[in-house]
Amino acid sequence: MTDTERTVASTAGAIGVSARDWGWRHASRKDFALRHVDFDIRPGERVLLLGASGAGKSTLMSGLAGVLGGDDEGEQEGELLVGGVDARSARGMCGLVLQDPDAQTILERVGDDVAFGCENLNLPKDEIWKRVRESLDIVGLDYMGFEHSTRKLSGGQRQRLALAGALAMHPGLLLLDEPTANLDPDGVRQVHDAVRHVIERTHETLVVVEHHIDVWLDLVDRVIVLGKPDAVHHVGGVLADGTPDEVFGRYGDLLAESGAWVPGRAIADHTKAHAMDRMGDGADVRPETTARIRRERSRDTVLYTEDLSFGRAFALGEHINVAFHVGEVTALTGRNGVGKSTLALTLAGLLKPLAGRVCVADAMVPERRENNVFTWKSGDLLGRIGMVFQEPEHQFVTSSVRDEVAVGPRSMGRTQEEAYAIADGMLGRMHLERFAKANPFTLSGGEKRRLSVASMLAAAPKVLVMDEPTFGQDYATWNEMVRLIAMVRDEGSAVIMVTHDDALVKALGARVINVSEGER
C-alpha cells in the first residue's frame, strides 16, 4: 500500500447503514415514494440497490445522503440511520455521485472542482490540497494538473472527477446513483475501474444504483431489491436481499415480474433491416455516397441534410450528407463529447447549422416556408419533427402529467376530450397513469423520461428525434419503450435516436451512424 492509499484508508473509516420501517412521501405527492424499508448494511459492504423504475431508489439514496430536506419537504416514516445517527445529521459522512456528468462539474479547473466539498467542510487549506492530490491519484486523474480545464473532460473523466470530489471529503459511505447511465462504453469502463480502485484502497461502504447491472456484479457482494409501493396497499419494502447468486437464482422470476433487470433475461426482437454507416473522415461526401443518397431521397426520404456542418462555438462535423427514411430507426452512436446531442438538436430544427441545411420531403414543407427546418416556427415543427431531449425537464411546459401529454394533440386542433383520450392511452402504455395529476417535475428520473417520450409520441410526428430514450428504465418499461418505438417506425415515421444502449440498437435492428470526432 502506498503512502497515499494508507492515508486515505486510515482516515475514511467505513460506516454502516440501517433502515427501520423507513418511508418517504414528497410534500407535493399523495403516495409514498417508498415505504416499509428494512435493512442493515455493515461497514465495508458493497451493495447493489435494484428495483423497478419508480421504486424509490434515488429517493433512498438522497435520504442516505441527507438531502431530502426537513418536514416541510415531505413526510418521513420510521428511521434511516447512517453511522448510527439520523441520516439528516450525517451529511459529512457520505459522498454522492449522480448520473449526469455535466451537472456535477461545478468549477472551471480540475483542482478547484475536487476541492469544493472540502472547502465546505472548513478544512485547513493545506489539508484540502493534500486530499485533492490523493483523490485524483486514486481515480486515475493524477496526470492532470490542478489548472486543467473541466470543459475539456470527457463524460467518463467528469464522472471520475465527481468521484474524486466525493472521495476527498473522506466519506465512510459512497453512494453512486446510476453513475454510468449517460456514458459511452469507454466512460463506463473508466468509472467502473475508478470505483474498484476506490473501494480496494479505502474500504468504504458502497451502495450503487444501476438498472443495467452487469457492470457492477464483479464489485458487489450483496444485492438489495426494493419493491414498488402499491397504489392501494402501499406495501413496498424489500423484495429480495442476499448475495448476487442468491438473489438472482432464487428470485429471478419475481424480480423480472416486478420490472427489475435480471442477468440473462432475453429482450424482445423488433428488428428490421440493419445497416451500418459512419459519419466521420469525410466518408459521406464521396460522389458515390452522394449519388446513393439522392436515389434514396426519391424513394421514401422524410429528412435529409445538404452539406451540413454542425456545432456551437466550433464545428463538430462538416460536409455531412445523410438521409433518413420512412419506417426506419437510425441510431447515432459514438463516444461522449463528439457531438451526438448537438447533431440531434440540429436535425430537429432547434439548433442553427454552421453551414448547409436540414431539409424534409417536399410534402412536409409548411405553406409559405422554405425547405430549411431551422427557419420554421415552433408551430411548423409540431406534427412534423418531434424532439425528446436528453434532460426531460427541458421540454415540460405544464403543471400536470396528463396535461403535458395532451399539449401536442391540443395544439394540433384536437378537442380537449380527444386530447385527453390520447393522453390517457399513452400514460397507460408508459405505466404513468397513477401520476396523471402529479407535477412532471416531481417524478423519478425514469418516469420523467417516459413522460417526455409520451408527450412527443402523442403529437405523432413524421420524424421523431430522441436523445437517450431508454436511460433510467427498468426491464418492463425498457421493453415497453422498445415496443413503442417499433410501433412508431412501423406506422411510417422516421426515428433518429442518440444512444449508448447496444441492446436497444439490436432490438430495433437500427441503422447505425457512428458520429466520429474526425469531423473536427
Per-region residue spans from a language model:
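Catalytic Walker B motif of ABC-type/P-loop ATPase nucleotide-binding domains
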Residues: 174-178, 464-468
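Conserved ABC ATPase signature
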Residues: 149-153, 157, 439-443, 447
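ABC ATPase NBD Q-loop/coupling interface
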Residues: 79-90, 357-380
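Conserved ABC ATPase "signature" region
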Residues: 127-144, 417-435
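Helix-to-loop junction immediately C-terminal to a conserved catalytic motif
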Residues: 65, 348
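ABC ATPase C-loop
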Residues: 166-167, 456-457
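Conserved catalytic motifs of ABC-family nucleotide-binding domains
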Residues: 170, 460
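Conserved beta-strand-loop-alpha-helix hinge in the C-terminal portion
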Residues: 230-260, 506, 516-520
